[in-house]
Curated annotation (Swiss-Prot):
It comes from the Bacteria. Gene3D superfamilies: Rv1738 (3.30.160.240). To M.tuberculosis Rv1738. It comes from Mycobacterium tuberculosis (strain ATCC 25618 / H37Rv). InterPro entries: Rv2632c-like, Rv2632c-like_sf. SUPFAM superfamilies: Rv2632c-like (SSF143212). This is Uncharacterized protein Rv2632c. Pfam families: Rv2632c-like (PF08962).
Length: 93
């Protein structure tokens, strides 16, 4: 493929963070190839810890993105199996 044949592709990931009491929930929404996928991550404040909102946000976001990645791996595995009619054995995540 030459530079003149290069085609860029994009996807969009939006993350919504909601806090209620001492719980934080993040939703990571992936929009790509006409599909929508949503990963969810939760975090809660341990009563023994000092409340630092950023830490709860980071943990909830990381968990939401991890959930989304796992869903994308599962979708990819299904697509490979549908295409090859063989079980997928070498897909690592």
């Amino acid at each position: 493929m030459t530079d003149s044949e290069h085609v860029g592709k994009t996807c969009q990931i939006d993350v919504l963070i909601e806090e209620h009491d001492e719980r934080t929930r993040a939703k990571a929404r992936l929009s790509w190839a006409g599909r929508q996928m949503v990963g969810v991550g939760l975090a809660r404040l341990d009563p023994a810890d000092e409340p630092v909102a950023q830490i709860g946000d980071e943990l909830a976001i990381a968990r939401a993105l991890s959930d989304l990645a796992n869903q994308l791996f599962a979708l990819t595995s299904s697509d490979i199996e549908a295409s090859t009619h063989q079980p997928v054995t070498g897909l690592h995540h």
